[in-house]
Amino acid sequence: MPFGLSAGSTRSEDGSEAFLEGMVDWELSRLQRQCKVMEDERRAYSKEVHQRINKQLEEIQRLEGVRHKLRVQISIAQSQVRRLRDSERLESMGHLLKCQVRVQAEVKELQAQNQALDREIQEWESRNSAHSKNARSPGCVQHDKVKSQRRIKSLENQLDKVICRFDIQLAQNATLREELDLLRIERNRYLNVDRKLQKEIQLLKDSVRNLMVSSTSAYTVREEAKAKLGMLRERAEKEVAQNETEVQILQRQIAHLEQLHHFLKLKNGDRQPDSAIVEKREQRAREVAEGLRKTSQEKLVLRYEDALNKLSQMTGESDPDLLVEKYLELEERNFAEFNFINEQNSELEHLQEEIKEMQEALVSGRRSEEDRRAQQEQQRAELQQRVDDVHSEADDLEARYHNFREQLEKLKTNIQHLFTRAQCDSTLINDLLGIKTHMRDRDISLFLSLIEKRLVQLLTVQAFLETQVVVMFNAALMVLGQSSEDFPKKVAPPQPPDNLEDPPGFEAKDDYPLSKEELLSSVMKAEQHLKELVESIKVESTPSMTSSTQKVSSSSRLVTQRPSQVPGSIMSHRTSGILVSSGGRATSSNVGHVTFGDSSATTGGLMSSRGSIPGRVTFRSPNSSSYLGSTGYVGSSRDHDSFEASKGPGSESSGGLGSSPGPASSPGPASSTGQASSTSKDSQSNY
């Protein structure tokens, strides 16, 4: 018996070692599979990393090339800008130096001429003193006096010409300064617009750069997600295939174990009792009933013998040692199979749980992928909607731009048509802009300013023509000694505005350009002011109503006692009102070129001559010489000339209607009326 027990134990140890070796082999195969999977993952990850590094290197090289190009462009732009600025500054400095040298030369020339004139004046004064010492005959003295006066007049004329030339140069300098100011303003505007556009371009570049960075990052993230998703799919497919094979193997093993378990159950079930055994039991029972009892030892032996017989009958083996060994071997095998079945059941449950988790993970991954796709579709739809909205808005803006452009072109054509219909002076525009067939957008204000000036001139002429009849009627009443209070009063014509002689391109800050209502209101205010002035003149002239001569002399004294007033002129009250309103100065901004003569008033002043036609008024268009009259040089020279002429023996200073009668004077109302028509014709022809 002890030997049988040791043999059974060795067999059980061999079975456990075989089981452990099987477990080790299975674990080794599992670890090898896991190692292969990890090796595949490592290769995929290394490949992905290499691709990402290559992409980043390519992007770095491209950005380096872009940076090099931008640096080259920036250096070129800076050099060009500097050269342009230097060339512009050199040109402006050269032009200014040339202007300075020319003006200095002209100033020196004028100073030399003034010195020469001073020397001649001193010589003539010394000659006059010498002639006065040498008492000659009255005829010689008169002849010398006439010669000296002629010489003085010629010198004064030369001085006036030089001063006019100097004034012309000053006016040209002023116009050039204004042009430079306008060009400087345009340059500043252009630089501001250029700076704004550069800022917008920089902002757009920054936004494009940010969008590129975000798009590249989103692309890399998308590629990474795609790679990970592909790896997960491959891994899931491999694991699913592996799990399916393992499940099939386990299912086969489970079916085999179930069959074995069923077989063992059937084998261990209750059997039918043997008839011999039943007879022996009945015989034993009869013997016990009869009282034939055996000892316990005998009973135990008999029991063992019966059991051994049963086992020998069941197994067909009569050797008890072999029976024990077979029994132990069967028990160990059953125990090992029981343990194996328990382990397989536990591992099957674990695998089923893992399969369930993997299925849930796959379902959640598919759901998240569907959600992500739905979100991407929604974002794509929103972006498409925004793009459509932006396109529609851009089309609307383009249509509005074309509409406004058409309106602007129509406005420019209408302005040009109005410019030609109004017969505006286009010499200033040709001088500034050159002869062009089309109008630029920035030239509209210049055309409108010239049209407005022409409109003011036409309104002035219209008011003058409307009030001419009333003025002649009032002059006739004053000559006849009557007053115009019983008659309806007419509004005096408006005086021309101060900006008629403004240079081209001049633009006032507050009230320029005026609208139609503002222009009418300003004209009405000027008429009201002139009306008050005329009434004040009439009030001052009422005490001296004794004769028409005293009336005309009192009205002529209002013109700061100028001897150039023509006797019997119908326009005496008109010119006196204008001169009084301007403070006694007949400037070119408030009085046009009023000529009471033929050619003696070439400088624009008010002069009278013996051969002039009294009452003839000529309004000339303002030019550069009339604009220069506002500087004070020409006016002073003309005033001095007219004053000297009034003192001379041959001058005709009219003190009233009765002075220096001749063919040129017509002191009657009829003559004044007749010459008023010539005045209106001359004014219309000049305009």
Swiss-Prot record:
Keywords: Cell projection, Cilium, Coiled coil, Cytoplasm, Cytoskeleton, Phosphoprotein. Residues 366-388 have a biased composition (Basic and acidic residues). Residues 126-147, 363-388, 487-511, 540-687 are annotated as: Disordered. GO terms for cellular component: axoneme; outer dynein arm docking complex. Its main location: cytoplasm. Belongs to the ODA1/DCC2 family. This is Outer dynein arm-docking complex subunit 1. It comes from Bos taurus (Bovine).
